[in-house]
């Protein structure tokens, strides 16, 4: 159970029983770890889990991704101190390729979310996405691959929108309505332009309208949406590539 409030600790320095997930951990000093967590009410937070690497530590088995936790911490600095963690349960852990997709989500959140910014709707979408990935793992090979693509594209689109990089997909950069039969290119800083020798990510009008309507049923839409989301995410991230994206690409090449 979470420890009681320490005397002299101001209320704004302590958070108790906050829902969250471990995104990533790394060693800190001899026996501790730093856990980057994604929480519903406080966004991304960095926590020191003191002694978590000791064999007898109650925290040791909880410092794993994709497990719903209740987290309690204190501190006003950017790096806070975890003082309690409790497993909530209720979520099936992803396995196999679904697990790699989950690590991809975590890397996106680590790279794109600023610490301390709450994103409650995105948190709920993250929980829903993990559940969808785990449940889709039981489908046939062909159905599973397509399901994973749909799930990832929806999350990418929601993530970009949540952090302020959401694009308009149903209107051209000049204000005209997107035509389903027309060919376009999409530029991250301008939007959709008629594909008349313009640089950008090639995309059909129908795919843009499908994106605007959050519809990923067409296989052609899935393929073009993947390239477009990659272009938008790369534009937001800068030059450093996503490690898990490369791993997913290599897995696809090994298991076509």
From Swiss-Prot:
Q: Does the keyword ATP-binding apply?
A: no
Q: Which GO terms describe its biological process?
A: DNA recombination; double-strand break repair
- Disulfide bonds listed in the record: none
Q: Which UniProt keywords apply?
A: DNA damage, DNA recombination, DNA repair
Q: Name one Pfam family in it.
A: RecO_C
Q: Which domain of life is it from?
A: Bacteria
Q: Which GO terms describe its cellular component?
A: bacterial nucleoid
Q: What does this protein do?
A: Involved in DNA repair and RecF pathway recombination.
Family, similarity comment: Belongs to the RecO family.
Q: Which HAMAP family match?
A: RecO
Query: PANTHER family, from UniProt?
Result: DNA REPAIR PROTEIN RECO
Q: What is this protein called?
A: DNA repair protein RecO
């Amino acid at each position: 159970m979470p420890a009681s409030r320490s005397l002299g600790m101001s209320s704004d320095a302590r958070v108790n029983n906050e829902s969250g997930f471990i995104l990533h951990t790394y060693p800190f000093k001899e026996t501790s770890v730093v856990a980057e967590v994604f929480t519903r009410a406080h966004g991304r937070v960095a926590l020191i889990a003191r002694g978590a690497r000791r064999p007898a530590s109650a925290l040791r088995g909880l410092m794993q991704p994709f497990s719903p936790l209740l987290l309690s911490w204190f501190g006003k600095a950017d790096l806070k101190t975890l003082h309690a963690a409790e497993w909530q349960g209720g979520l099936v852990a992803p396995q196999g390729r679904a697990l790699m997709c989950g690590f991809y989500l975590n890397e996106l959140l680590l790279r794109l979310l600023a610490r301390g910014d709450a994103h409650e709707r995105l948190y709920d979408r993250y929980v829903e996405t993990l559940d969808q990935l785990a449940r889709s793992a039981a489908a046939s090979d062909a159905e599973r691959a397509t399901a994973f693509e749909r799930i990832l594209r929806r999350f990418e689109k929601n993530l970009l929108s949540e952090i302020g990089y959401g694009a308009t997909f149903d209107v051209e950069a000049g204000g005209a309505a997107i035509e389903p039969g027309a060919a376009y290119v999409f530029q991250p800083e301008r939007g959709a332009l008629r594909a008349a020798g313009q640089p950008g990510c090639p995309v059909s009008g129908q795919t843009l309208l499908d994106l605007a309507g959050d519809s990923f049923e067409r296989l052609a839409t899935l393929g073009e949406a993947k390239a477009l989301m990659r272009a938008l995410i790369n534009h937001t991230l800068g030059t450093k590539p996503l490690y898990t994206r490369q791993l997913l690409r290599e897995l696809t090449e090994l298991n076509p």
